């Protein structure tokens, strides 16, 4: 599923290996195993785990939830900063299938933004 995340201020729990940071799901959904990218399309890393405020492991985060997200790849302060926003990086083959599903209007908007971003480099992405 498409998703939009915000890295919360003062919510850095570990800097790297994996980086564990507090994030709010601004729209859509986020799952373990998904890759995330900056709003300009720069790849960041892969989500390894999601935890709620009560330290409970979850498989999925939905819009409005605040989670501790373990991301393999980036170093806080070098690759990502507090206040950064991210998209879930969807593979082109999944974008085709997602269009056929019953997405919420916000999820459709996020998918459209991700599609536009990828089509700058590949005109046929997700078709």
Identify what each model region corresponds to.
Residues 2-127:
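Beta-strand/loop-dominated core regions that host nucleotide or nucleotide-derived cofactor-binding catalytic loops
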């Amino acid at each position: 599923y498409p998703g939009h995340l915000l890295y919360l201020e003062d919510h850095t729990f570990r800097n790297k290996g994996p980086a564990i940071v507090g994030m709010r799901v601004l729209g859509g959904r986020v799952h373990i195993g998904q890759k995330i990218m900056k709003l300009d399309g720069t790849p960041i890393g892969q989500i390894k785990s999601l935890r709620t405020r009560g330290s409970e492991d979850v498989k999925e985060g939905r819009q409005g939830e605040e989670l501790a997200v373990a991301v393999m790849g980036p170093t806080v302060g070098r690759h990502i900063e507090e206040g950064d926003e991210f998209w879930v990086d969807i593979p082109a083959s999944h974008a085709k299938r997602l269009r056929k599903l019953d997405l919420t209007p916000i999820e459709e908007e996020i998918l459209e933004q991700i599609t536009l971003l990828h089509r700058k480099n590949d005109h046929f992405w997700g078709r």
